[in-house]
UniProtKB/Swiss-Prot annotation:
Gene3D superfamilies with a match to the protein in the record: 3.60.21.10
Keywords from the named record: Hydrolase
UniProt KW Hydrolase keyword: yes
Keyword Hydrolase annotated: yes
Cited InterPro entries: ApaH, Calcineurin-like_PHP_ApaH, Metallo-depent_PP-like
PANTHER family associated with the record: CYTOCHROME C5, PTHR40942
Top-rank EC class of the record's enzyme: hydrolase
Molecular function per GO: bis(5'-nucleosyl)-tetraphosphatase (symmetrical) activity
Protein known as: Bis(5'-nucleosyl)-tetraphosphatase, symmetrical
Function: Hydrolyzes diadenosine 5',5'''-P1,P4-tetraphosphate to yield ADP.
Similarity remark: Belongs to the Ap4A hydrolase family.
One Pfam family this sequence matches: Metallophos
Swiss-Prot/TrEMBL catalytic activity: P(1),P(4)-bis(5'-adenosyl) tetraphosphate + H2O = 2 ADP + 2 H(+)
């Protein structure tokens, strides 16, 4: 039995299948962790979601911002933007079971035996792991509650509040939790977010750092796997931080990480998110 983690899929099914073939993934015995952003922008969002649903018993999945956007568009199609590739999912005859499965997924996963956490964007520096798990559960409960789902999905958009306070309530509280776990890149040591800057490590606004670079970060005792930040290209100079979004949908690569051995595998992607031909999977012992 092997456990693998894969970076942002964003509807790029061919590169995912390339990686699974590369490691001889067997859904009967192996496990696949997904860092979120399963859909959107790539060429096969519906097919990707259907494939994941077919092997759902083998998956551990956390939701990304694009997955939450899809759920919001499911309830209000006017949420769709021109750049979205999600309409085919909403209009699919099997949409309901796909959406019901999606809304059951987590925002934060923790494997206690391995000491590894996984979130789409990361864990803000001012939260302990226990706090992060508790706050994530608040959003997860809203997603699974039919009476609260629409209110949450309509209210989750926006950049404010840009900092956590235990006194926050209602949809504002859920929004900032969501932004930390699914949209965060740069923040201050106190957790004030900058959600506009999306480039690499050297582009931090004054007073801000990548969330994982703060020396006082309270989750340092855990290894954290995350995606979301394609501009990093998987490169972080920080022990215990595993960045897996390597920009497949932008013509980069899709990266798979063996959670137990530490080995990386990569399949290169074409500019349209399909598999670059000829397909030449790469095994990387030292991910660079």
């Amino acid at each position: 039995m092997a456990t693998y983690a894969v970076g942002d899929l964003q509807g790029c099914l061919q590169p995912l299948k390339c990686l699974l073939e590369r490691v001889s993934f067997n859904p009967a015995v192996d496990r696949l962790w997904l860092v979120g952003d399963l859909v959107n922008r790539g060429p096969e969002s519906l097919e990707t979601l259907r494939f994941l649903y077919s092997i759902r018993q083998s998956l551990v999945c956390v939701l990304g911002n694009h997955d939450l956007h899809l759920l919001a568009a499911w309830h209000n199609v006017e949420r769709l933007k021109k750049s979205d590739t999600l309409r085919e999912i909403i209009e699919a005859p099997d949409a309901d079971p796909l959406f019901d499965w999606l809304r059951q997924q987590k925002l934060l996963h923790y494997d206690e035996a391995r000491g590894i956490a996984m979130a789409h964007a990361g864990i803000p520096p001012q939260w302990t792991l226990g706090q992060a798990l508790g706050y994530a559960a608040e959003v997860e409960e809203a997603l699974r509650d039919d009476s609260r789902l629409k209110l949450y999905l309509d209210g989750m958009y926006g950049n404010e509040p840009n900092k956590w306070s235990k006194n926050l309530t209602g949809v504002e509280r859920l929004r900032v939790i969501t932004n930390y776990l699914t949209r965060m890149r740069f923040c201050t040591a106190e957790g004030k977010l900058d959600l506009k800057s999306k480039e690499g490590l050297g582009t931090a606004p004054k007073g801000y750092k990548p969330w994982f670079a703060h020396k006082g970060r309270r989750s340092r005792h855990v290894t954290i796997i995350f995606g979301h930040w394609a501009a990093l290209e998987g490169r972080v100079d920080e022990p215990g931080i595993i960045a897996l979004d390597t920009g497949c949908v932008w013509g980069g690569a899709m990266t798979l990480y063996n959670v137990d051995s530490g080995e990386y595998h990569r399949c290169d992607c074409a500019d349209d998110g399909t598999l670059r031909q000829p397909a030449q999977p790469t095994t990387l012992n030292d991910h660079t």
